[in-house]
Amino acid sequence: MDTIVRRDMIFDNVQVCSGQKREALRAISHLCAKDDMAYELKLIAAFREREALYSTGFGGGIAIPHARINGLAEPLFALARFDRPVEWDAIDGKPVDLAVVAVTPGEAERDIHLPILAMLARKLMDENFVRRLRACTDKTQLYYYMLRELPPVKA
């Protein structure tokens, strides 16, 4: 796998009218599923199951919703910037405006899932990376910034 970044998985100004995590996860699932209702429902269920274990609110206005889904052909990475802050039960108690999403095949715990999460966590702890990410003004800038900054993930 060369890169996990795909242009069609960068979402800007995602509407979350209620400002609640449940609706945000539903919106992310809908956008990522691209009109595949069965896949959308799997994503929603997988994200909710993970959130029931612990919040994926990373802190600093960022969440890393992630899940594993059996039978998934390849890992999915998405970036969603919300139209308003979302209450997420983050570790710092602050609402979330950016969600960095990782979904991997259920069989890929050691091979792909953990390396992707570790790489994302390292990048998101870098204040300069996050500041420049937030400075992107549209979907195109977000895409090219992420493409340039995220290293390839070895499958």
Where on the chain are the PLM-derived regions?
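Cytosolic covalent-transfer regions centered on His/Cys nucleophiles
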Residues: 1-155
